[in-house]
Design a protein with these regions (language model features):
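Conserved Rossmann-fold cofactor-binding substructure of NAD(P)-dependent oxidoreductases
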Residues: 54-75
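Conserved beta-loop-beta element that borders a ligand/cofactor-binding pocket
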Residues: 124-141, 151-153
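Mid/C-terminal beta-alpha module of Rossmann-like enzyme folds, strongest
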Residues: 185-247, 263-264, 268-290
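N-terminal Rossmann-fold cofactor-binding loop
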Residues: 36-40, 57, 77
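Conserved loop-to-helix N-cap of the C-terminal "lid" that shapes the substrate pocket in Rossmann-like
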Residues: 132, 141, 166, 171-179, ...
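A conserved pocket-lining segment of Rossmann-fold NAD(P)-dependent short-chain dehydrogenase/reductase
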Residues: 152-173, 177, 181-185, 189-192, ...
């Protein structure tokens, strides 16, 4: 029998790349955790201290039942589900944390970014006691997509082609820091208010990320610049001809847009200081996830 010491927290999206670590961290802190997701088998593989609860944001009645009695709610589901979550919240819920994305700041035409902006607007209109977090590129989990792709590339090739030589900047954030940000957003009195960006401490170029991955694997690589415009044109031609490429034109466009953010609110309102990319990558590899 679990001893409830810190209150009840419901976590939606509990089986995702970040959700499963948040569930474990909240259990460590003594919460009675309702881990909510669509797949019972995956839910039952989470921290055994959590209660698996099957629900689907596309089926509002199931979510309302899953959230009944929750004192705090953290949703790691896509921001397009914000209104469904708002409608399902129990009366008297003391804190709500929802997930957006720094993709909402893009200047490129992007339906995914529009969905995040719409979710942010819905959450703001609701006037709930809580906050929306906008994570940047999250890395560090065993199955993180972006960094694992770079690690595979570095293992397979000595010469790495990058759009514009990889000079464009991103600000990846380590998964442990993301989890601590969610915990703080659930607990700290300074958390509620405008959305908070969850990002690494400073921008890093794609080229520097590749070199850090090579160093972590004790490999030497050479980076070859490829004009982004030519890659976009090639992707368009390949698509028209039905040829599958490992990238599409939209991916190249996004890769040439600097993604630079100020993590000041993350530090000030949440008390979380994100670690540099190289440090997070070392931790990922030390855990055997490289």
């Amino acid at each position: 029998v679990r001893k409830r010491t810190a209150g009840t927290v419901a976590v939606l999206g509990a089986t995702g790349k970040t959700g499963r670590y948040l569930v474990a961290r909240l259990c460590e802190r003594g919460y009675d955790v309702a881990a909510i997701g669509r797949d019972r088998a995956r839910l039952e593989a989470l921290d055994e201290r959590a209660r698996p609860v099957v629900a689907d944001l596309e089926a509002p009645a199931t979510v309302k039942a899953a959230l009944a009695g929750a004192e705090r709610v953290a949703s790691l589901a896509h921001a397009r589900h914000a209104q469904a979550l708002i409608d399902a919240l129990p009366a008297g819920c003391a804190r709500v944390v929802v997930t957006g994305s720094t993709r909402r700041f893009t200047r490129l035409p992007d339906p995914a970014a529009e969905a995040v902006r719409a979710g942010e607007a819905a959450f703001a209109r609701a006037g709930l006691p809580g906050v929306m977090l906008h994570p940047s590129m999250i890395y560090g989990a065993p199955d993180d997509r972006n960094v694992n792709r770079l690690l595979r590339l570095v293992r397979a090739r000595r010469v790495i082609p990058l759009p514009d030589g990889g000079r464009h900047r991103v600000q990846p954030v380590f998964v442990d820091d993301v989890v601590e940000a969610y915990v703080a957003a659930l607990e700290r009195e300074t958390a509620p208010g405008p959305p908070i960006v969850i990002a690494g401490p400073e921008p890093i170029t794609y080229a520097a990320m590749v070199r850090a991955c090579a160093e972590a694997l004790d490999r030497r690589v050479a980076i070859v610049p490829l004009p982004a415009g030519a890659l976009i044109a090639a992707a368009r031609v390949a698509r028209a001809l039905g040829i599958a490429l490992p990238f599409d034109a939209d991916e190249i466009r996004r890769a040439t847009e600097d993604k630079v953010f100020d993590p000041g609110e993350m530090r000030e309102r949440l008390g979380v200081s994100p670690r540099p990319f190289a440090e997070g990558l070392r931790l990922k590899c030390a855990r055997g996830w490289c």
